[in-house]
Amino acid sequence: MASIHTFILQPGAREIALCAKWRLEAFGDVLGASLQDEIKRLEDFVAGGQGQVALMARCDGVPAGTCLLTPTELEPCHPVSPWLAGLYVVPEYRRRGIGRLLISATEEQARQRGNSHIYLYTDDAIAFYEGLGWRVIEQTMWMDHPMALMARDLRA
């Protein structure tokens, strides 16, 4: 059985560049940044303070995914916080529980910071998140694209 673990990226971590590359692969149309710009954004995010965290997952020591806990999300966003954002698992590591582990670790980071709820937007993974205890709060539109606003009660 594979060994999977998550950890918080620290300022100056060499993995930041890899996470930035993954973020551009998955969300480049939304991020609208060059690789160097996204590396800088992620470095600033990691150094940004207590309310935000960048997590990485490793599978048998190999980088396999990332996820963010962030106080804000897509603009204009709903006036709630914090957000689970930027979940990405490397294609060859999908369907091994890495996404679930990253979500759980992100939820725990939110809980440790005293939050009772956490939120996310998704366009195509509603059933996946519902299976993890999340619920749809609202169907909305973002840039003419349907999205679901979802929440998870961290007290449960």
Residue ranges and their predicted role:
Residues 54-56, 62-72, 83, 88:
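Conserved beta-strand in the GNAT
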Residues 116-125, 138-156:
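C-terminal "cap" of GNAT-fold acetyltransferases
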